[in-house]
UniProtKB/Swiss-Prot annotation:
This is SsrA-binding protein. The keyword Cytoplasm applies. Belongs to the SmpB family. The keyword RNA-binding applies. The gene is smpB. One of its GO terms (molecular function) is RNA binding. It holds the Pfam family SmpB. InterPro entries: SmpB, SsrA-bd_prot, SsrA-bd_prot_CS. It is found in: Cytoplasm. It comes from the Bacteria. GO terms for biological process: trans-translation. Keywords: Cytoplasm, RNA-binding.
Amino acid sequence: MAKKSHQENNDNLIAQNKKARHDYFVTDTVEAGLVLTGTEIKSVRAHRVNLKDGFAQVRNGEAWLMNVHISEYDNGTYFNQDPLRNRKLLLHKKEINKLVGALQDKGVTLIPLKMYIKHGYAKVLLGLAKGKHQYDKREAIKRREQNREIERVMKHY
């Protein structure tokens, strides 16, 4: 039996940052592991994650995921952590150095696009992104509307 690709199996998708591609031009992506506590991974498996305001930084040769909200586990008692705490990202040194070089450019940031479970481990897909201006967003909306209209007309022929 053929191995399923990541795109075919969306059962493991935990959270997706839908506004990211609307607000940013995403140029490159990289997959990173997450260092989580026991109660945090239980909340992740329960899909209680919000990536909306999250971003990543490289400090002292280590990558950190900031401002990602992982809700407290209901049965966690005193083992629960702060929902917005900084979480370490697991990347190879070469990948971190590549990101440091890319982040030197003005206006480039690192944002989480998706969080998913892969082989039992929580992973986050990070995107190197540059912010869009308002007129870029309007242009994208116009282009999308034109394509929808063309598809609607072509459907009848």
